[in-house]
Amino acid sequence: METQNTLRKPMDGTGTSPMTVLKRLWPYIRPLIGIVVLAVVTMGVVAATEAGIPALLKPLLDHGFGSHGSDSAKWYVPIAVIGLALVRGVSQYTSNYLLNYVSNRILLQLRLEMFQRMIHTGASFFQRETASTVINAIVFEVNQILSVLTGVMVTLVRDSLTVIFLLGYLFYLNWRLTLIVAVILPGIGWLVSKINRRLRRLNREHQTLTNELSYIVEETVGGYKVVKVHNGEAYEMDRFTTMSKRLRGYAMRMTISGGLAQPLTQFLASIALAVVITIAVVQSSNDQTTVGGFVAFVTSMLLVISPLKHLIDVNQPLQRGMTAAELIFGLIDEPAEPQGGGRPLSQARGEIEFRAVSFDYGAAERPTLDRISFKVAPGEMIALAGPSGSGKTTLVNLLPRFFDPTDGTILVDGVPVSDYDLHALRSQMAMVSQDVVLFNDTIAANVAYGQTPDRARVQAALEAANLADAVAAMPDGLDTLVGGNGMRLSGGQRQRLAIARAIYKDAPILILDEATSALDSESERHVQAALERLMEGRTTLVIAHRLSTIERADRILVLEAGKIVEEGSHDELLRHGGLYAHLHRIQYQQQAA
């Protein structure tokens, strides 16, 4: 299955360019501009030392050799070489350290902003984006920006200055020969521009396929039990192989495009070198150049080739960096969920009302919810029943504002939920989902998630959830690590730990999506008792799967195709003989079987 990466998009109307990326990075660079300037100065010193080497060769060859050689040239040139090497080494170390300091500071800021925006986006973001895409953006792709800030900047600044210094020295030595070398540069620039556009497109497609490959691995790891039980190893291997081969194809196309630049550039440079040697030989016969001048010129010209090659090779990491920037700033620019009207809500009574609420996901042919209206009194328990796809989960997701209704109003204590501060509203709600989510932390931290653990309250919550004895038997008690998503706990323990978390929060409104996973009778009994304690005295909306839960509800709302088609108590709905009675009969027969 292919996923669409909606985070990665051009950063302006004309597409992503280095200048666009620089503009986005400027607010992060500006506070550190003094350090950046110092790094550029030290890189300039490094570049200047490149031109210093051939500059020392000329007097050495012209005046330091032979019986008539200058004694001063014999000694000051070697000493100057050592001095140049020392200055170059210190400057290179300083520039590398300063740039890495700047880039790591910016990397930290970007990573923190990305994670902060990710946790404050709406639920639609998590439905739209795969986990592998978000993980790649925050953990891996942001390092491409680090590569741009260090390696690419070093290349662009230091090697550009090196080329400028060397070309300046070449003009000083022999401007006629230098013009021949300069003729080659436009040809190199044309090659770079042609290769540049293709590399950018290939990089974008390559990184999209990398996310696809990560998604396949993520699905296979997460669903390993299904893979093994259904003998899906061959199918998953085929999926992975197909995507890996596509990824390899794009990698080879990138290698071909990126690899052409260097040999073509070197070929053009060799033509220039051959012409220079020919003309220099003619000039030397007319005493227009010296041996030292010729060697210094050829040395300078050869020294120009390496930084030019680096400047050309910078395209690939630069394009990867710009492609990564699209993903990074796509996440940073993702709109945050609305924070509400700012009205405080310190302690809700628990009164809930839906007034003609409708909702659709945009692509659906019919609304997921169609003009739903009902009212829940404080402390009342409402069970939601209905066939799969009837809108039960969507309905409960609207209450904590994971989504906002497309029409109608939801009220808590007589006030529209949009008027409340979002955090204040959610602080009045606890949720126990069908898919239990636990964090790779201690028992205590999972129970008190989002708050500072009070060990006495944690212990009380565990006792109410019938989990205290099991935790006490663990080697580290409350400090026991549960593993990734509670993998070190049994299914019943995971469910009861999620219930303990809701008990610890002690919110007046409870949203419960009962788990349908089969448990042994002992675990089922413990979970059911914990749920009953959890629901005591709380306004509860429960998507009920157990007959016992449905039967003890104050009212049952039966949904079908996004509408409430029946409402009443368990006995009333059975007597009515409608959809609920039909669903009840099917479930009763399944349980009896």
From Swiss-Prot:
The enzyme's E.C. designation: 7.5.2.6
Cellular component terms per the entry's GO annotation: plasma membrane
SMART domains, per the entry: AAA
Transmembrane helix in keyword set: yes
Start and end residues of each ABC transporter domain: 352-586
Membrane-topology annotation of the record: Multi-pass membrane protein
Positions annotated to bind ATP: 386-393
One of the record's GO molecular function terms: ATPase-coupled lipid transmembrane transporter activity
NCBIfam families with a match to the protein in the record: MsbA_lipidA
Annotated family: Belongs to the ABC transporter superfamily. Lipid exporter (TC 3.A.1.106) family.
Known role: Involved in lipopolysaccharide (LPS) biosynthesis. Translocates lipid A-core from the inner to the outer leaflet of the inner membrane. Transmembrane domains (TMD) form a pore in the inner membrane and the ATP-binding domain (NBD) is responsible for energy generation.
Name this protein carries in UniProt: ATP-dependent lipid A-core flippase
Organism: Burkholderia orbicola (strain AU 1054)
